[in-house]
């Protein structure tokens, strides 16, 4: 179901800037939300203090920081993008999740180690996001939870024993990651077995496993199963990579306008799903190159004369769907995006939302059982609704580069992961 805000509430409209020629720009992208919030969890559960460098400051990461502070964790801002995290006994408290999936799914297992009840709530949309899998998993591990959706209260009473837990994570890989991040603190560790349909967004689970190992935790992996041994999570220094998924709309600007966009400090080795944009843009006709720069690399993308459509299974990279769908709506040939039925449970039902908004601008988008079919069409201006979804908002901005008169409702919803997005975008377009 697409979340529709109260019609009595007037949301601001942003005139998406139209590109008048090829866009050429060199950009630095803020840190990864996914890595920042995982680092915050691991630092809070560690045995010694940690330092986190190049922290992303956004609504989602601020919600995570505030949630951990409400549980008694000391987080000191040494600089705007540098935190010192001092772990300690977790206490009873109240956590505001907003619309952040990482907060509502990563913090309940952490709350199992608090010395009293922890209450969770969030935005209205958050109350309909899937939560049963993670909450049932906690119950099977001996943790008391009083509801199946937000709002709910977690109350463990004493350190849970742990053990084997079966979970259907076909709706979100965050269910697995949430359990894995806290698993070393359970007395006997935790074995997580996924028993549902195809598991989406595997790179995010790989990110979680990689970071746990970097913090000294032993994990054994097999198909749909993770065995996390009990042990001390080591405090350490975490340096956060740029958020590659947040880079994708800017790279799309090169693809749409035939220009060249360079993203600074692109990691040569990463678990971020956003790295897949390199191969996607190549398949759609772009020139893509990693350029050595000092001790690292920049990513350079130059757009084609005519953008080609793409047929792609996006089950592991679902968060890129709004960017790719926007590109597909502007492409010269048909696109088919599959493997993304789970996006119906994201900030909004992204499949229904993308279909509605593309078609309102004259596009031809058909919602499939597990994806989208997007055919070439001549688009026109109009209001693009964001549904309080940051990636829907950036998709509208992409289309606005090539279509006169596109207006994006509530562009500031991008502050969820990229505060000031619209200012950076306008400066890029010029």
Swiss-Prot record:
Q: Where does phosphoenolpyruvate bind?
A: 33, 101, 129, 174, 350, 391, 416
So where's the catalytic machinery, residue-wise?
319 (proton acceptor)
What are the alphabetically sorted keywords of the record?
Answer: Amino-acid biosynthesis, Aromatic amino acid biosynthesis, Cytoplasm, Transferase
Reactions this protein catalyses: 3-phosphoshikimate + phosphoenolpyruvate = 5-O-(1-carboxyvinyl)-3-phosphoshikimate + phosphate
Q: Where in the cell is it found?
A: Cytoplasm
Which Pfam families has this protein been placed in? Answer: EPSP_synthase (PF00275)
Binding positions for 3-phosphoshikimate per the UniProt entry: 33-34, 38, 172-174, 201, 319, 346
Matching entries from InterPro entries are given as: Enolpyruvate_Tfrase_dom (IPR001986), Enolpyruvate_Tfrase_sf (IPR036968), EPSP_synthase (IPR006264), EPSP_synthase_CS (IPR023193), RNA3'P_cycl/enolpyr_Trfase_a/b (IPR013792)
Q: What SUPFAM superfamilies has UniProt attached to this entry?
A: EPT/RTPC-like
Q: What is its EC number?
A: 2.5.1.19
User: Which terms under GO biological process does the entry name?
Assistant: amino acid biosynthetic process; aromatic amino acid family biosynthetic process; chorismate biosynthetic process
What family does the entry list? Belongs to the EPSP synthase family.
Please describe what this protein does. Answer: Catalyzes the transfer of the enolpyruvyl moiety of phosphoenolpyruvate (PEP) to the 5-hydroxyl of shikimate-3-phosphate (S3P) to produce enolpyruvyl shikimate-3-phosphate and inorganic phosphate.
Q: Summarize subunit and interaction data from the UniProt record for this chain.
A: Monomer.
Q: State the protein's name.
A: 3-phosphoshikimate 1-carboxyvinyltransferase
Q: Which organism is it from?
A: Corynebacterium glutamicum (strain ATCC 13032 / DSM 20300 / JCM 1318 / BCRC 11384 / CCUG 27702 / LMG 3730 / NBRC 12168 / NCIMB 10025 / NRRL B-2784 / 534)
Please state the gene responsible for encoding this protein. aroA
